[in-house]
Protein backbone atom coordinates (compact mmCIF):
# COMPACT_ATOMS: atom_id res chain seq x y z
CA UNK A 1 0.00 0.00 0.00
CA UNK A 2 1.29 3.46 -0.84
CA UNK A 3 1.95 4.87 2.61
CA UNK A 4 0.15 8.18 2.09
CA UNK A 5 -3.08 6.35 1.16
CA UNK A 6 -3.60 4.87 4.60
CA UNK A 7 -7.40 4.67 4.73
CA UNK A 8 -8.44 1.54 2.84
CA UNK A 9 -12.09 0.70 2.14
CA UNK A 10 -13.53 -2.54 0.84
CA UNK A 11 -16.07 -1.47 -1.77
CA UNK A 12 -17.46 -4.87 -2.81
CA UNK A 13 -18.44 -7.34 -0.08
CA UNK A 14 -21.18 -9.92 0.44
CA UNK A 15 -22.75 -11.37 3.58
CA UNK A 16 -24.62 -14.55 4.41
CA UNK A 17 -27.48 -12.42 5.74
CA UNK A 18 -28.64 -11.55 2.22
CA UNK A 19 -26.40 -13.13 -0.42
CA UNK A 20 -26.92 -16.84 -1.09
CA UNK A 21 -23.21 -17.10 -1.92
CA UNK A 22 -22.11 -15.44 1.33
CA UNK A 23 -20.37 -17.55 3.98
CA UNK A 24 -20.21 -15.09 6.88
CA UNK A 25 -22.54 -12.56 8.47
CA UNK A 26 -22.16 -8.83 8.12
CA UNK A 27 -20.86 -8.54 11.68
CA UNK A 28 -18.28 -11.27 11.05
CA UNK A 29 -17.18 -9.53 7.85
CA UNK A 30 -16.86 -6.19 9.63
CA UNK A 31 -14.81 -7.71 12.45
CA UNK A 32 -12.49 -9.44 9.98
CA UNK A 33 -12.04 -6.26 7.96
CA UNK A 34 -11.14 -4.21 11.03
CA UNK A 35 -8.60 -6.87 12.05
CA UNK A 36 -7.20 -6.79 8.51
CA UNK A 37 -6.55 -3.06 8.81
CA UNK A 38 -9.38 -1.62 6.74
CA UNK A 39 -10.73 1.79 7.69
CA UNK A 40 -14.19 0.69 6.61
CA UNK A 41 -16.33 -1.43 4.32
CA UNK A 42 -19.24 -1.16 1.92
CA UNK A 43 -21.62 -4.08 2.22
CA UNK A 44 -22.96 -4.76 -1.28
CA UNK A 45 -25.20 -7.81 -1.12
CA UNK A 46 -26.88 -9.23 -4.21
CA UNK A 47 -30.27 -7.66 -4.81
CA UNK A 48 -33.65 -9.14 -5.76
CA UNK A 49 -32.62 -10.48 -9.16
CA UNK A 50 -29.11 -11.45 -8.10
CA UNK A 51 -27.86 -14.38 -6.01
CA UNK A 52 -30.06 -13.43 -3.07
CA UNK A 53 -31.37 -15.55 -0.19
CA UNK A 54 -34.32 -13.46 1.02
CA UNK A 55 -37.81 -14.93 0.55
CA UNK A 56 -39.08 -13.32 -2.70
CA UNK A 57 -42.70 -13.68 -1.57
CA UNK A 58 -42.36 -11.18 1.27
CA UNK A 59 -44.12 -7.84 1.11
CA UNK A 60 -41.72 -5.26 -0.32
CA UNK A 61 -41.08 -3.32 2.90
CA UNK A 62 -40.31 -6.49 4.85
CA UNK A 63 -38.19 -7.84 2.01
CA UNK A 64 -36.07 -4.68 2.00
CA UNK A 65 -35.78 -4.78 5.80
CA UNK A 66 -34.42 -8.32 5.71
CA UNK A 67 -32.22 -7.52 2.72
CA UNK A 68 -30.52 -4.75 4.71
CA UNK A 69 -29.98 -6.88 7.82
CA UNK A 70 -26.34 -7.71 7.11
CA UNK A 71 -25.52 -4.04 6.71
CA UNK A 72 -27.68 -2.92 9.63
CA UNK A 73 -26.11 -5.31 12.16
CA UNK A 74 -22.60 -4.66 10.86
CA UNK A 75 -23.20 -0.91 11.10
CA UNK A 76 -24.30 -1.27 14.72
CA UNK A 77 -21.14 -3.22 15.49
CA UNK A 78 -19.02 -0.68 13.63
CA UNK A 79 -20.54 2.22 15.54
CA UNK A 80 -19.52 0.53 18.79
CA UNK A 81 -16.02 -0.30 17.58
CA UNK A 82 -14.88 2.82 15.70
CA UNK A 83 -15.22 1.19 12.29
CA UNK A 84 -17.00 2.59 9.23
CA UNK A 85 -19.70 0.44 7.64
CA UNK A 86 -21.50 1.84 4.60
CA UNK A 87 -24.46 0.57 2.57
CA UNK A 88 -24.55 -0.37 -1.07
CA UNK A 89 -25.86 -3.27 -3.11
CA UNK A 90 -25.07 -5.24 -6.25
CA UNK A 91 -27.84 -5.13 -8.84
CA UNK A 92 -28.19 -8.14 -11.12
CA UNK A 93 -29.46 -8.12 -14.70
CA UNK A 94 -29.19 -11.70 -16.00
CA UNK A 95 -25.50 -11.91 -15.11
CA UNK A 96 -24.60 -8.27 -15.76
CA UNK A 97 -24.04 -6.58 -12.40
CA UNK A 98 -23.78 -3.04 -11.08
CA UNK A 99 -22.59 -1.72 -7.73
CA UNK A 100 -25.03 0.84 -6.38
CA UNK A 101 -23.99 3.46 -3.85
CA UNK A 102 -25.83 6.42 -2.37
CA UNK A 103 -29.27 5.05 -1.50
CA UNK A 104 -30.44 3.39 1.71
CA UNK A 105 -33.16 1.19 3.18
CA UNK A 106 -35.62 4.06 3.48
CA UNK A 107 -35.10 4.99 -0.17
CA UNK A 108 -35.56 1.40 -1.34
CA UNK A 109 -38.81 1.03 0.61
CA UNK A 110 -40.24 4.17 -0.97
CA UNK A 111 -39.03 3.36 -4.50
CA UNK A 112 -40.38 -0.10 -5.29
CA UNK A 113 -40.13 0.80 -8.97
CA UNK A 114 -36.39 0.14 -8.74
CA UNK A 115 -37.18 -3.59 -8.49
CA UNK A 116 -38.19 -3.98 -12.13
CA UNK A 117 -36.32 -1.00 -13.52
CA UNK A 118 -34.36 -1.42 -16.74
CA UNK A 119 -30.65 -0.59 -16.73
CA UNK A 120 -31.54 2.82 -18.12
CA UNK A 121 -34.28 3.39 -15.55
CA UNK A 122 -31.99 2.24 -12.75
CA UNK A 123 -29.43 4.86 -13.77
CA UNK A 124 -32.07 7.59 -13.77
CA UNK A 125 -33.52 6.60 -10.40
CA UNK A 126 -30.16 6.29 -8.68
CA UNK A 127 -29.05 9.62 -10.10
CA UNK A 128 -32.23 11.30 -8.94
CA UNK A 129 -31.37 10.04 -5.46
CA UNK A 130 -27.85 11.46 -5.70
CA UNK A 131 -26.27 8.02 -5.98
CA UNK A 132 -23.70 6.35 -8.21
CA UNK A 133 -23.75 3.33 -10.54
CA UNK A 134 -20.51 1.37 -11.06
CA UNK A 135 -20.32 -1.50 -13.55
CA UNK A 136 -18.96 -4.45 -11.57
CA UNK A 137 -16.38 -6.74 -13.19
CA UNK A 138 -17.67 -5.88 -16.70
CA UNK A 139 -15.57 -8.47 -18.56
CA UNK A 140 -15.89 -11.43 -16.22
CA UNK A 141 -16.80 -14.66 -18.00
CA UNK A 142 -18.63 -17.36 -16.02
CA UNK A 143 -21.49 -19.80 -16.51
CA UNK A 144 -23.90 -17.41 -14.78
CA UNK A 145 -22.97 -14.59 -17.16
CA UNK A 146 -24.50 -15.41 -20.57
CA UNK A 147 -22.59 -12.65 -22.34
CA UNK A 148 -20.52 -9.54 -21.74
CA UNK A 149 -22.84 -6.54 -22.01
CA UNK A 150 -21.66 -2.96 -21.68
CA UNK A 151 -23.81 0.07 -20.90
CA UNK A 152 -21.44 3.05 -21.04
CA UNK A 153 -24.30 5.55 -21.24
CA UNK A 154 -25.92 4.20 -18.06
CA UNK A 155 -23.02 3.92 -15.61
CA UNK A 156 -20.89 6.45 -13.77
CA UNK A 157 -17.77 4.34 -13.64
CA UNK A 158 -16.24 0.89 -13.79
CA UNK A 159 -14.81 -1.56 -11.28
CA UNK A 160 -11.42 -1.75 -12.95
CA UNK A 161 -9.76 -4.01 -10.38
CA UNK A 162 -11.65 -6.93 -8.88
CA UNK A 163 -9.32 -8.82 -6.55
CA UNK A 164 -10.96 -12.19 -7.20
CA UNK A 165 -9.47 -12.03 -10.69
CA UNK A 166 -5.85 -11.80 -9.59
CA UNK A 167 -5.24 -12.12 -5.84
CA UNK A 168 -3.52 -15.37 -4.89
CA UNK A 169 -6.05 -16.00 -2.10
CA UNK A 170 -8.94 -16.08 -4.57
CA UNK A 171 -10.46 -19.46 -5.36
CA UNK A 172 -12.75 -18.34 -8.20
CA UNK A 173 -12.95 -16.14 -11.30
CA UNK A 174 -9.14 -16.21 -11.63
CA UNK A 175 -8.23 -14.32 -14.77
CA UNK A 176 -6.25 -11.04 -14.59
CA UNK A 177 -7.26 -10.28 -18.17
CA UNK A 178 -10.78 -9.52 -16.93
CA UNK A 179 -9.27 -6.52 -15.14
CA UNK A 180 -7.06 -5.54 -18.07
CA UNK A 181 -10.13 -5.32 -20.29
CA UNK A 182 -12.07 -3.40 -17.63
CA UNK A 183 -9.25 -0.87 -17.34
CA UNK A 184 -9.20 -0.41 -21.11
CA UNK A 185 -12.96 0.11 -21.04
CA UNK A 186 -12.64 2.68 -18.28
CA UNK A 187 -9.89 4.54 -20.09
CA UNK A 188 -11.80 4.52 -23.38
CA UNK A 189 -14.72 6.39 -21.82
CA UNK A 190 -12.66 8.36 -19.28
CA UNK A 191 -14.69 6.71 -16.53
CA UNK A 192 -13.84 6.96 -12.86
CA UNK A 193 -12.38 3.57 -11.89
CA UNK A 194 -12.71 1.66 -8.63
CA UNK A 195 -11.34 -1.48 -7.03
CA UNK A 196 -12.91 -4.06 -4.73
CA UNK A 197 -12.37 -7.62 -3.56
CA UNK A 198 -15.84 -9.10 -4.16
CA UNK A 199 -15.34 -11.19 -1.04
CA UNK A 200 -17.91 -13.64 0.31
CA UNK A 201 -16.14 -14.87 3.45
CA UNK A 202 -13.77 -13.67 6.15
CA UNK A 203 -10.85 -14.75 3.98
CA UNK A 204 -10.19 -11.17 2.93
CA UNK A 205 -7.98 -10.24 -0.02
CA UNK A 206 -7.06 -6.72 1.03
CA UNK A 207 -8.43 -5.11 -2.12
CA UNK A 208 -10.34 -1.87 -2.38
CA UNK A 209 -9.96 1.88 -2.70
CA UNK A 210 -7.62 3.85 -0.44
CA UNK A 211 -7.63 7.53 0.44
CA UNK A 212 -5.37 9.96 2.27
CA UNK A 213 -8.21 10.97 4.57
CA UNK A 214 -11.15 9.08 6.04
CA UNK A 215 -14.50 9.02 4.30
CA UNK A 216 -17.27 10.98 5.97
CA UNK A 217 -20.18 9.20 4.30
CA UNK A 218 -21.31 7.29 1.23
CA UNK A 219 -21.95 10.65 -0.43
CA UNK A 220 -18.35 11.61 0.28
CA UNK A 221 -17.19 8.38 -1.38
CA UNK A 222 -19.32 9.02 -4.45
CA UNK A 223 -18.07 12.58 -4.77
CA UNK A 224 -14.42 11.55 -4.51
CA UNK A 225 -14.80 8.77 -7.07
CA UNK A 226 -16.85 10.82 -9.53
CA UNK A 227 -14.42 13.71 -9.40
CA UNK A 228 -11.51 11.27 -9.79
CA UNK A 229 -9.85 12.92 -6.83
CA UNK A 230 -6.66 11.64 -5.28
CA UNK A 231 -7.08 7.94 -4.40
CA UNK A 232 -5.43 4.58 -4.96
CA UNK A 233 -6.71 1.19 -6.07
CA UNK A 234 -5.45 -2.19 -4.89
CA UNK A 235 -6.10 -5.90 -5.36
CA UNK A 236 -4.40 -6.56 -2.03
CA UNK A 237 -1.06 -7.35 -3.66
CA UNK A 238 -0.28 -4.28 -5.74
CA UNK A 239 -1.43 -0.69 -5.46
CA UNK A 240 -1.74 2.02 -8.10
CA UNK A 241 -3.02 5.58 -7.91
CA UNK A 242 -5.92 6.61 -10.10
CA UNK A 243 -3.61 9.04 -11.90
CA UNK A 244 -1.09 6.27 -12.62
CA UNK A 245 -3.84 3.94 -13.79
CA UNK A 246 -5.27 6.54 -16.16
CA UNK A 247 -1.83 7.07 -17.69
CA UNK A 248 -0.79 3.41 -17.74
CA UNK A 249 -0.02 1.98 -21.16
CA UNK A 250 -1.70 -1.36 -21.73
CA UNK A 251 -0.76 -3.90 -24.37
CA UNK A 252 -3.32 -4.57 -27.09
What is each stretch, according to the model?
Residues 42-43, 134-135, 159:
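Conserved beta-strand positions in the central sheet of alpha/beta enzyme cores
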Residues 46, 138, 163:
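Flexible loop residues that form catalytic
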Residues 1-11, 15, 26-31, 94-108, ...:
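Charged catalytic cores and adjacent phosphate/nucleic-acid-binding surfaces used
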Residues 61-74, 115-120, 173-180:
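Well-ordered, non-membrane alpha-helical segments in soluble/globular domains
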Residues 112-142:
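Internal catalytic-core helix/loop-beta-alpha segment
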Residues 19-24, 55, 110-113, 170-173:
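Short, solvent-exposed loop/turn segments at secondary-structure boundaries
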Amino acid sequence: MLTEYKYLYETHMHTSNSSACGSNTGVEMAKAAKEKGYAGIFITDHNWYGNNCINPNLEWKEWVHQFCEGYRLAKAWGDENDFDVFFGYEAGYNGTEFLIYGVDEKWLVSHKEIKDASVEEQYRLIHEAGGMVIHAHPYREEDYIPEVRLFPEYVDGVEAINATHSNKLSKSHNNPNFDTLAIKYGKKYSFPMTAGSDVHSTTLFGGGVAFKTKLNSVKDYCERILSKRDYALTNGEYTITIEELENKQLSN
